[in-house]
């Protein structure tokens, strides 16, 4: 799929948070997609016509970006183009949680991607504010299936192990690097990358599993370079962009169907 992505170079429209916009754009370019970064409400209809997919990230949410996201969903949905929602921090505030629910109620979201706390909060399950470090009675497999069923989406839960579900099947994806949790924007770029893969119009469940595996493998490859050069967080960020731009052979990442 990565080869096809690089041949097609899909245009991915991002309504993302201001902290990570440059990193997300560079990451998409490294993968082989073309980034478009805009949250101007007046141009949502025009951009929906020329873009191949939309990624919405609520990391720096405000009243204007809420209206922008709603307007964008309306136009992308009308054109039957894929939309990824990354409900960043939706378990942390009423505004984020309420906005996420409103966007999901549009029934235009194709993929809902987040950590355990974020996805859990959208189905009434408390997993703690940090998500990845939380302890909860409901398993990740149960949460991701429930999310997919409730909102009729492909649910993607990221963490040390990723889980992807269409409400029936669940795939787990292992591998990756601990450094992903130590840089800003890894999850935001992941959501944009999900949108780029969806634009290829392949089976969405398989596409998301493949994307998660490739992303984790690139992170693993970057970590090896960090170790070889006695680096740390900063060098990982640059090696990760390099790894995304190179051919990615799945060696460390494993996709497994859960029963």
From Swiss-Prot:
Pathway: Cofactor biosynthesis; thiamine diphosphate biosynthesis; 4-methyl-5-(2-phosphoethyl)-thiazole from 5-(2-hydroxyethyl)-4-methylthiazole: step 1/1. It catalyses: 5-(2-hydroxyethyl)-4-methylthiazole + ATP = 4-methyl-5-(2-phosphooxyethyl)-thiazole + ADP + H(+). Substrate binds at residues 37, 185. Its EC number is 2.7.1.50. GO terms for molecular function: ATP binding; hydroxyethylthiazole kinase activity; magnesium ion binding. InterPro entries: Hyethyz_kinase, Ribokinase-like. The keyword Phosphoprotein does not apply. It comes from the Bacteria. ATP binds at residues 113, 158. GO terms for biological process: thiamine biosynthetic process; thiamine diphosphate biosynthetic process. Its cofactor is Mg(2+). SUPFAM superfamilies: Ribokinase-like (SSF53613). Keywords: ATP-binding, Kinase, Magnesium, Metal-binding, Nucleotide-binding, Thiamine biosynthesis, Transferase. Catalyzes the phosphorylation of the hydroxyl group of 4-methyl-5-beta-hydroxyethylthiazole (THZ). This is Hydroxyethylthiazole kinase. It comes from Helicobacter pylori (strain Shi470). The lineage of its organism: Bacteria, Pseudomonadati, Campylobacterota, Epsilonproteobacteria, Campylobacterales.
């Amino acid at each position: 799929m990565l080869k096809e992505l690089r041949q097609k170079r899909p245009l991915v429209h991002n309504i993302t948070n201001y902290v990570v916009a440059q990193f997300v754009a560079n990451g998409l370019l490294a993968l082989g997609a073309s980034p478009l970064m805009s949250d101007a409400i007046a141009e949502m209809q025009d951009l929906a016509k020329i873009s191949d997919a939309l990624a919405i990230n609520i990391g720096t949410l405000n009243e204007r970006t809420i209206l922008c996201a709603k307007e964008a969903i309306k136009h992308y949905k009308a054109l039957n183009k894929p939309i990824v929602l990354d409900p960043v921090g939706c378990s942390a505030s009423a505004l984020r949680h309420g906005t996420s629910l409103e966007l999901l109620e549009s029934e235009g979201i194709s993929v809902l991607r987040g950590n355990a706390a974020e996805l859990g909060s959208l189905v009434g399950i408390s997993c703690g504010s940090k998500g990845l470090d939380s302890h909860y009675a409901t398993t990740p497999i149960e949460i991701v299936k429930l999310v997919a069923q409730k909102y009729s989406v492909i649910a993607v839960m990221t963490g040390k192990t990723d889980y992807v579900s269409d409400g029936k099947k669940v795939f787990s994806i292992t591998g990756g690097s601990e450094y992903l949790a130590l840089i800003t924007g890894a999850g935001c770029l992941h959501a944009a990358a999900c949108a780029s893969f969806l634009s290829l119009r392949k089976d969405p469940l398989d596409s998301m599993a493949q994307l998660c595996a490739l992303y984790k493998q690139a992170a693993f490859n970057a970590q090896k370079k960090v170790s070889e050069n006695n680096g740390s967080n900063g060098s990982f960020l640059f090696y990760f962009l390099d790894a995304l731009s190179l051919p990615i052979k799945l060696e460390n990442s494993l996709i497994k169907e859960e029963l």
